[in-house]
Amino acid sequence: MTDEVQITQLYQEMYTTMVNKDRAVLERIHDDSFVLVHMTGMHQPKASYIGAIMNGTLNYYAAEHEGSHVAVRGDTAILSGRSRVTAAVFGGGKHTWRLQLRFDLKQKDGAWYFTHAEASTY
């Protein structure tokens, strides 16, 4: 399996684990240095991000993937993914967003990990 295929599968797995609130997998696929930059500009480190998923501050219901692009350079990669994401976040109502995420990833010991993400709409 190519790195590009592994990373694309990791992206899809990430959404599945967000919907299922699977803390163990979320912890495994995000590097300890991970930071999510929300559309508002808020920076959320890994522990806070996963905690918000688990406590319902970030509620994800479904994700329909519309496409992604992966560029690998050695042991780092960039993934840009577009998905229609149904969620209720930060106390707002349930809504479907056209969410674009740009991820930085690193590879260590043969596995890929998300290190940084920036959210926007498309």
Would you name each region that the model predicts?
Residues M1-R28, S33-Y122:
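A beta-strand edge to alpha-helix "cap/lid" segment located at domain peripheries
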